[in-house]
Amino acid sequence: MLVPHRVGAAEPARAEARELAALAAAKGCVLQVGHVERFNPVLHALEAQLKNPRFLEVTRLSPFPNRSTDIGVVLDLMIHDIEIILHLVRSPVESIDAVGIPVLSRGEDIANVRFRFANGCVANVTASRISQERVRKIRVFQENAYLSLDYKNQSGYLLRLAREDEKESSGLGKLISLATDSKIVTDFSGHRIVREPVEVEKGEPLRIELESFLQCAREGLKPRVTGLAAADALDLALEITRRIEESDPRRAG
């Protein structure tokens, strides 16, 4: 709902999304859309390390819900990762390969999508609501570095090529142990690889989101998730849903 004073909004329907964004701009209102994962401290830590990502692997798994079963997992869960990916890659989508399978409901309960972007980046995204555990992870491959981050635990680590000073000071290492949080320099096929934790200042994403909105409203700042950014994610999510529905063999005949 949009009123003359500043207001937050849940994800609107497609027919209303861009109209809502345009109306907010015309009225000088601050419109922020509730993609709460954008306010996870993990994402802030990731952006500090991000340099021209080439491949993203995103996984979001959840137990079967007692709500939102009237929509598929793309609109229920994956849309949050779609919005994040568009924000991180910042390049037009050139192609979409999507598959989705209904398991316990009429819509897709598990879906996998591969995006190819104009700048050459590829993103592989999996969302499922048929899982015994909650998993929310993002992995980023970029030049000379790999990042693995966990939204749920607000933790992560970085693998990168060693700097010259690290090459000189370190001895010959063993294979990297992913169970430790300490900095390790490893010799691997003639390359020195450093594994180190990603510093995450932990916090409650919903609280951060609300505080961010209030600050934007008070100071007239641009929201982290604008109406247009959310509309772009919604358009893409609905296109994925359409392709999954059209490929459903139950529609044949």
Annotate each predicted stretch with a short phrase.
Residues 17, 39-43, 81-82, 207-211, ...:
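A general structural signal for well-ordered alpha-helical segments in protein cores
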Residues 65-141, 151-153, 228:
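Rossmann-like dinucleotide-binding domain that binds NAD(P)(H)
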Residues 4-6, 32, 57, 124, ...:
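Structural detector of well-ordered beta-strand residues that form the stable sheet scaffold
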